């Protein structure tokens, strides 16, 4: 019995020792000028999250925020003992409302005031004009999702357009395996020109989101309706260079979805 009590006492002493040491180290660190500096400046570097905008069954995705990870930043800088802005380490602040908890909504716009997305559906009419253009998003029909095409289009973000906009589980399973293996992105967006709850459910069940462009057409439609966050489906690529120059001239950057 005495032996058991002694062992219990030793274990308790060791645990207390670790606990006490940890408390002492935390206290010492909190008084370190570097830690004081990090706590004083953390608000200056904070970027608040932006909540998603939801209107019935449509959504404009939100944005994650950022805050300084005090402990990791301190560990990164403590060897030198001085504050270095370039060594700050951040962690995400998630919005309370985002696409991650509203996947059953149609995405109808991006969340940036100075960025737009340009989508092209790959076919015999468009393929000659898009191969070497970066930052556009390309949708391929099921029959066009081949090793050759995907390797040729590796500069772009690639997704499946199903069978000319008709999605089934079998098509998504097949196409996503190929895209995820060969392209530089994961296949996570379906494309619809209008709302369709059947395709929305099929895509959601395959862990994909559904995008409906805010602008569909050519130069005139873009010129008349272009705003920050626009998702543009370009149906005629014969003057894509002119369209890209126009978008850039209005101060917008073209980004993938």
Task: Set out the residue ranges of the language-model regions.
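Short, glycine-rich nucleotide/cofactor-binding loops
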Residues: 121-125
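A short, well-structured beta->alpha microelement
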Residues: 102-107, 215-221
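Metal-dependent polysaccharide deacetylase catalytic core of the NodB/CE4 family, i.e.
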Residues: 116, 126-220, 226-231
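Terminal accessory/targeting
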Residues: 1-118, 130-137, 227-257
């Amino acid at each position: 019995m005495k032996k058991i009590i002694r062992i219990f006492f030793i274990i308790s002493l060791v645990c207390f020792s670790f606990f006490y040491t940890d408390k002492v180290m935390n206290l010492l660190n909190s008084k370190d000028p570097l830690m004081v500096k990090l706590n004083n400046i953390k608000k200056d570097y904070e970027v608040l999250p932006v909540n998603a905008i939801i209107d019935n069954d449509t959504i404009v995705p939100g944005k994650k925020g950022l805050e300084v990870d005090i402990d990791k930043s301190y560990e990164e800088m403590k060897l030198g003992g001085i504050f270095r802005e370039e060594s700050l380490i951040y962690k995400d602040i998630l919005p309370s409302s985002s696409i991650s908890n509203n996947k059953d909504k149609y995405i109808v716009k991006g969340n940036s005031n100075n960025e737009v997305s340009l989508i092209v559906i790959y076919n015999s009419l468009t393929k000659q004009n898009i191969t070497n253009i970066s930052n556009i998003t390309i949708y391929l029909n099921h029959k066009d999702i081949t090793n050759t095409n995907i390797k040729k289009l590796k500069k772009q973000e690639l997704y499946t357009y199903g069978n000319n906009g008709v999605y089934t589980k079998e098509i998504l399973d097949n196409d996503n395996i190929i895209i995820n293996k060969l392209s530089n992105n994961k296949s996570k967006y379906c494309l619809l020109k209008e709302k369709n709850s059947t395709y929305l459910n099929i895509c959601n069940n395959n862990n994909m989101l559904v995008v409906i462009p805010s602008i569909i057409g050519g130069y005139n439609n873009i010129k008349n309706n272009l705003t920050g966050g626009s998702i543009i489906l370009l149906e005629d690529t014969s003057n894509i260079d002119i369209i890209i120059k126009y978008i850039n001239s209005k101060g917008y950057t073209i980004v993938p979805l």
